[in-house]
Amino acid sequence: MANYFNTLSLRQQLDQLGRCRFMARDEFADGCQFLKGKKVVIVGCGAQGLNQGLNMRDSGLDVSYALRQAAIDEQRDSYKRASSNGFTVGTYQQLIPEADVVYNLTPDKQHASVVEAVMPLMKKGATLGYSHGFNIVEEGQQIRSDITVIMCAPKSPGSEVREEYKRGFGVPTLIAVHPENDPEGKGWDQAKALASATGGDRAGVLESSFVAEVKSDLMGEQTILCGMQQVAAVLAFEKMVDDGIDPGYAGALIQYGLEAITEALKIGGVTNMMDRLSNPAKVKAFELSEQLTDLLRPLFEKHQDDIISGEFSRTMMEDWANGDANLLKWREETGETAFENAPAYEGEISEQEFFDHGILLVAMIKCGVEVAFDVMVEAGILPESAYYESLHETPLISNTIARKRLYEMNVVISDTAEYGNYLFANAAIPILREKFMPTIDTTVIGKGLTAASNQVENKRLVEINEAIRSHGVESVGKTLRGYMTDMKAIVV
């Protein structure tokens, strides 16, 4: 199979990258009615598979799970998850032939083998669904011509898809139809119905393309969503402990601080996050963010370039073929970091203290969000897509860190995201250790600014506020957040 994106002409590539339209609420007036009475068979029951399935069932759809015979015979975790939640579970041969929609929610590395196994069993005119287009775009999977191919891609980990739905809300979602596979013209109606059934229409849905979803999703998860947060956790903890701060406090400041800081980001963008700081702290965070940008922008650009060209996918698939040697090595190394092994903290940290003592964390989040957004837009991805793949999803990843640190983040995200995260973090950490962290002290991470540093020039503050508010991610973010009026605060 050849990389699908690389078979397109430049004009076609730019057209597919630039597919992005925020859909009006009235376009979902029929909810998931288009799929009512249809048989939806989900293949795989991991985080996305289970949680999307629960939402779809609660929305009134007929949902069952097709698993490999061995998974059923050995009662593996996927079987236990599906059966314990009361779903019908069967083999591919038992369930796929009657399915109207086969929804492939297995890990990326399994997509090719899964599709090759289920496609001969699918009835004529059935639909194949994805939540990530890697198999279509990067692996170039060829799908039978009578099959409709759609995507419904919630922009969050599977656990958050469920939690937001239970709150009466949802997570922003991208939908798409593969241009090579819509023989009956029903793809968009089905994709809209899936988005409604999983709760996405309550938060906002983007009409996108397989190409735009893949190229933006890979960039977001590698840089700001996972990579930058892992970099922040590892380096901030090292600095605090080296400077004499209690390891328990340092670990808690990062583990729960990232969640508190990015909750402010979610509710009101970079502007609100920065406004939670005192004026002197805001100036300091802004200046640190500018320094970080100068050092890390070339790395962000390299990641986006490698994603666009297919180089990232090529090297990752080589690692798949090598038994995930690099992935497993990097996972083990992450588990051995000092932050991951920090003792529990018995004290309490107030919400404001996370900001006052975590100026460096704020600066790193600001840098990551803005640079990831800018680099995606420069590559031809539209601002709306870039916003969801940078700013909006960041707090959802921070929530996983708050549960069980980096281990939880890397368990919840896909193997593809985890691989890209390590690739970015392993490159960024040495750069910052050498060129940035020696300039950092406990005034910006661990203790906060002293009274003597509590001064700021009015003109400088005005310039900084204007720079923050006028950034592209803030402009599009204000518009998109306007559609999410029912957003509930995660941190109570």
UniProtKB/Swiss-Prot annotation:
Residues annotated as catalytic = 132
Annotated Gene Ontology cellular components are: cytosol
Can you provide one Gene Ontology molecular function annotated for this UniProt record?
ketol-acid reductoisomerase activity
User: What positions does the entry give for substrate binding?
Assistant: 414
Binding-site residues for Mg(2+) 2, renumbered to this chain: 217, 389, 393
EC assignment: 1.1.1.86
For this protein, the record's PROSITE patterns field holds: KARI_C (PS51851), KARI_N (PS51850)
Q: Which is a GO BP term held by this UniProt record?
A: L-valine biosynthetic process
Superkingdom is Bacteria
What positions does the domain KARI C-terminal knotted occupy? 209-344, 345-487
Task: Provide the alphabetized UniProt keywords.
Answer: Amino-acid biosynthesis, Branched-chain amino acid biosynthesis, Magnesium, Metal-binding, NADP, Oxidoreductase, Repeat
Q: Does the keyword Manganese apply?
A: no
Q: What Gene3D superfamilies does this protein map onto?
A: N-(1-d-carboxylethyl)-l-norvaline Dehydrogenase, domain 2, NAD(P)-binding Rossmann-like Domain
InterPro entries documented for this protein: 6-PGluconate_DH-like_C_sf (IPR008927), 6PGD_dom2 (IPR013328), KARI (IPR013023), KARI_C (IPR000506), KARI_N (IPR013116), NAD(P)-bd_dom_sf (IPR036291)
According to UniProt, this protein's pathway is: Amino-acid biosynthesis; L-isoleucine biosynthesis; L-isoleucine from 2-oxobutanoate: step 2/4; Amino-acid biosynthesis; L-valine biosynthesis; L-valine from pyruvate: step 2/4
How is its cofactor bound, per UniProt?
A: Binds 2 magnesium ions per subunit.
So what family is this one in? Belongs to the ketol-acid reductoisomerase family.
Q: What is this protein called?
A: Ketol-acid reductoisomerase (NADP(+))
